[in-house]
Amino acid sequence: MEKVRTRFAPSPTGFMHLGGLRTALYAYLYAKHNGGDFILRIEDTDQQRYVEGAVELIYSSLKGSGLIYDEGPDVGGNYGPYVQSERKEIYHKYAKKLIELGGAYYCFCSKERLESLTDENGNRKYDKHCLHLSKEEVERRLAAGEPYVIRQNIPSEGVSEYEDMIYGTIRVDYADLEDNILIKSDGMPTYNFANVIDDHLMGITHVIRGTEYLSSTPKYNLMYDAFGWERPKYIHLPTIMKDATRKLSKRYGDANFDDFVKKGYLKEAIINYVALLGWTPKDNIEKMTLPEMVKMFSLDGISKSPSIFDEMKLRWLNGEYIRELSEDDFYAHALPYLEKSAVYGKFDLKKIAKLLHGRVEFLGEIPEKIDWIVSLPEYDLALFDNKKNKTDREVAKALLPEIKAWLEEIDDFSNDNLFTALSEKAKEKGVKSGSVFWIMRIAITGMAVTPGGATEIAELLGKTETLARIDKSLGYLTK
């Protein structure tokens, strides 16, 4: 049985877009599920869109997310070079061969002539003008050094038919296709040509890419057939949408992998969520490690319908991953965000991390969740009103001085001791402990929702700061 070989072939034009990451992930999962190889190829034929440093970002994004490729520019392999700009001679060799086979031809048309083909609706389709040049005329113009491109010779009529492993039988009228350029005037190949040559020479068995290539695939098949090569199997993936009407777009700066990492999403969670954008595992399992995905991956679970990117679901999933981290691992992940916050250098960061663990969905929200630690913010006294705990401003005004007195008597300001001591004091007083802790929380944080309860926060703040904040809140209540 033929060994499965898939590839991810991104253009180095910026950050790793989530759509590209999903293509890489599915290509990786399909190859590894079937005991095959996953190859990285850099498609840098469009030099005008090349972004410095983008290739290194591709390497780091793939390796950082666990998608380890078996062959590629930086790891080598038997089918290199794996960068298209280093394969120009190969493309020219096959372009000339395709011309000999009648599948392509030289085109010398000027920019002005091409523009004259534009109709009243702004559409332009090449009219095969140079297809009819004699061999002698072509050789004369080449010898004279005239600029040229090489175009594919698409049949003027008939229907192309091929099978896609997701969408089934695809039919495209040749009349709807244009004699697209294969080799540009600067000598560089276009994607339409290079991907066919490379996929064949690199032994790619399954081509996995987005549905935007469904209508272009007949052009590629014409070249496979002209060369007498076996066509690869095609797996086209559904579009990822930003919302009901707009696609996620790399060109417009939408969701990229590095942005989410910087926001504080764990790479494992991002990969897990991206896997679900178009694929539903059996039993509707949502949380999976990469090895589990490899084991479960099946084309049967891939949808034909577009999927909508939902950052709230990513946040939920990321929160699940954060809660599974050990205390030390969470601290290591949280530390860069704690160091950027106002608490740095003033409080015990390990205690803050312990307070936050399991109470954040992504690490980037840490600074805003702890800004109250530095100083008590001004707050609305209506926060003391709580039916469940039977408190209001008047109850707080009466009870807070007693809470302060109780705290003054306590030397051990650890969470456990504070909780036990205050619960006993509340019982002796004949009030609900919930009332005591609610009033205390508002008084020392100015917030109804905090990462941690009143006694956890008091331990973090320490006795002196806790009592100072209670004094400040008493001042608010007695104005």
Q: Which sequence ranges carry the predicted segments?
A:
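Active-site cores that bind ATP or allylic diphosphates and position pyrophosphate for catalysis
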Residues: K97, Y105-H236, K242-L248, N256, ...
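Residue-level signal for inorganic ion chemistry
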Residues: A27, I58, L98, G102, ...
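Structural motif
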Residues: F260-E268, K304-D310, V343-I352, K427-S435
